[in-house]
């Protein structure tokens, strides 16, 4: 499974088939991860954990009930749709980058922004409480795009799409 099915399984511990999430959830679909399904974030929040999501949600955006902040995450930073532009944060003609449901206009490569936010959340958390952090990267998802320094490191690859894909993985692993 990819995208939405994998995220649904990771967050619920159930098979994506059982959840009815068998393919990526398109922006125009009026569905998401069933609101009757309890996420690990909800369980852990109830147990006193701080719960954070940095990165890609992609489990529904047609209803407010699908939003990560309504699914057990105290804080959410990233995007709710599928594959966004790595630099412009646009999906399907619309800007999709936010913090807790509020649109943010931030510049930078999304892989790096997600990683920096995850580190910030770890450093700034309440050290007296346990932490659950779900860092959900979009790399190496389409569109294939990487910083110049990462492309230069993969310059030995002749095919431009494969080079960009390898550069994205290299940047993700950095």
Which role does the model predict for each range below?
Residues 1-174:
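Formylglycine-dependent sulfatase
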């Amino acid at each position: 499974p990819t995208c939405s099915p994998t995220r649904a399984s990771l967050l619920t511990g159930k098979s994506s088939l059982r959840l009815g999430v068998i393919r990526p959830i398109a922006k125009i679909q009026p569905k998401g991860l069933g609101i009757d399904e309890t996420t690990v974030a909800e369980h852990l929040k109830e147990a006193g954990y701080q719960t954070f999501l940095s990165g890609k949600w992609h489990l529904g955006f047609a209803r407010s009930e699908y939003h990560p902040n309504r699914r057990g995450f105290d804080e959410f930073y990233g995007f709710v749709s599928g594959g966004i532009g790595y630099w412009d944060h646009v999906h399907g003609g619309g800007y999709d980058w936010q913090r807790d449901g509020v649109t943010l206009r931030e510049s930078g490569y999304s892989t790096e922004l997600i990683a920096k936010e995850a580190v910030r959340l770890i450093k700034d958390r309440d050290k007296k409480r346990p932490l659950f952090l779900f860092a959900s990267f979009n790399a190496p998802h389409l569109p294939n795009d990487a910083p110049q320094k990462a492309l230069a490191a993969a310059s030995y690859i002749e095919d431009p799409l494969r080079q960009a894909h390898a550069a994205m993985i290299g940047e993700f692993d950095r």
